[in-house]
Structures are given as structure tokens and as C-alpha cells.
Amino acid sequence: MKKKIAIAMGGYSSEYRISINSGNIVYKHLDHDLYEPYRVHILKGEWFVVADDDTPYPINKSNFTVKINDKVIQFDCVFNTIHGTPGENGLLQAYLELIGIPQTSCDYYQSALTFNKRDLISVLRPYGIKAATNYFLNKDQEINTKEIVDKVGLPCFVKANRAGSSFGVTKVKTEDEIISAAKTAFTEDDEAIIESFLDGTEVSVGVITYKGKVLALPVTEIIPDGEFFDYEAKYLGKSQEITPARISEEDTKKVQDIAIMIYKKLKMKGLSRSEFIFHEGEPHFIEMNTNPGISQASILPQQAEKAGISLKDLFGSTIEAALNQK
């Protein structure tokens, strides 16, 4: 009998449209001979299954079931493609764990940790992971711009601490710009992190569990048309993404080994993508995406293709890993 797979997409953040694209890619490429997939939209106001004729059927949140044509559907697994809250910050994972449904992304603790830029870097530093100097802000605290500049220098990046797809990110070149940049960050989160500028080559490393083994995918070099890899660069084609990256074999292995080490130390599972900048010859960690985009414009599918892994095989392996951990 085919396993019933709920493809969770949407979410409560600015990234919900990206997530819908990712979820539809999974629905399209998943092997329908092996699985019975359902598109589950998880939005602030309602959770519902979208049928092939676009009819919405509400999800029963008490047990994550849906009633279609008088038949109650119980899902065997959730393929989590939600970027941002609640699918990438641990909330959905915790809910599914409580009701006993396996899901494809990392567990709730790892999800919450990796979604918090400050906390993740604090955990990784003792392992020798290099990262930019940073300064943390709460929304209600007074902003001392001189103290910030003294610590991180200029230019710097002001970011929402818990947001993805470069929403709420501003590159700041003068001290006078810090206040307005912080306000932009606070539209996405009530915490902000300010990081020193790292000059160098930016790369992205996909690390996945594929057929039972942790695997680093070919490294992608990112060259944004603008000043940094923002939303438009990521999803509107305003960047060059070169796979494999134009770095030495030694540097490729170095950054892949670090990405795998992070994945294993954090006890990750499923799909992930970590970003680094080679600054002064050494990879500096930027962030980790535990539900990376898998739309046509996304990096991870490009990397999988270069590794000879089809999306059908990638998604199938991800589901089987989740089912086997039930």
C-alpha cells in the first residue's frame, strides 16, 4: 500500500510564497507510484489540503488528519517544505512529534537552534568554526550606534536574528544608517544581529542524508548582482550561481568537511544547506538552512543534479529516512 505523504508548505512568514513553490516541486517530482502525496497548505488562518481540482479540505489539527469525500486520511509522513515559522523554527516539528507523525526535516531542538543566528554561532564557535564578529539587539533596547561600530566595524550587516531568505537584511555603510536598518530587521523579528563585513568568496554547501549516508553535495559559488545575496538575488535570478564553485580542490574539501562536521555535531537529519564566506583564505560560517529552498531557482536542486541525484531519488530517500526513524 502506498504511504500517504503530507507535503507541508506555506507558513506564517514572508517566505510563504517560496515555500509554496518548493512544496509544489516535491509534489511534482515525488514518485507517485510509491507514494500518495497531498499538498497541505499551512497558513496563519487555516490549514488545509489542496486537491487536484484546487478544492480545499480543512486539516483536523487535533490529529493532523483530513476528511475527503467522507473518508478520513491519516498521513504516514510529513515532507516539510516550510521556510520560516512554523516549519523551520521547531514549532511544526514539536507538534508532529507529540502526535507521532514522522517528518523529513531536523528535530524541533535543532530546528529552533539553527533558526536563531546568534545562538547557532555561539554553539559552533567552541568547535573552531570561524564566523563574523557580531552584536545582538532586542527590539525594545536603546541602540548605541558608536558601541556597535566599535565592535563590528563598517560596513556591516544588520539582520533579523530569526528569519530566512535574507528578509530584514541591510548592508550598512555609515553609522547613521544603523537605526533605520535595525527598524527594517525588526519588521521580521523582535531580535536583530549585526555582523561585521567579510570580504571574500561566498559559497553554499548542501549536506544531506542520502540512502543512509551523510553526503556533502558539490559546492556552489554565489556572485550576487547587488552588494549581497538578498531575496532578489536568491529567487529573482539576480545572481550568478556556479556549481561547482571556482575554488581549489583543497578549499572545496575543507568547506565540505566543515559543513559535514556541523551537520553531525548538531545531530541533523534530512536536507540542509550551509553558507560560508572564504575570508582571508578561511571559510567563515554565515548560516544554516534546515529546510532549504527546492524550487526551480534554488541552489540545492542544482547541487543534487551535479552529484547525479534526481529530485525523485532525493525526495524518496528523504521520506524513507524519516519513516525508518519512526
UniProtKB/Swiss-Prot annotation:
Main localization category: cytoplasm
Cofactor: Mg(2+); Mn(2+)
EC code(s) of this entry: 6.3.2.4
Pathway annotation from the record: Cell wall biogenesis; peptidoglycan biosynthesis
Binding residue positions for ATP: 149-204
GO biological process assignments: cell wall organization; peptidoglycan biosynthetic process; regulation of cell shape
Keyword Cell division in annotation: no
Record Pfam families: Dala_Dala_lig_C, Dala_Dala_lig_N
SUPFAM superfamilies in the cross-refs: Glutathione synthetase ATP-binding domain-like, PreATP-grasp domain
Function: Cell wall formation.
Entry protein name: D-alanine--D-alanine ligase
Source organism of this protein record: Christiangramia forsetii (strain DSM 17595 / CGMCC 1.15422 / KT0803)
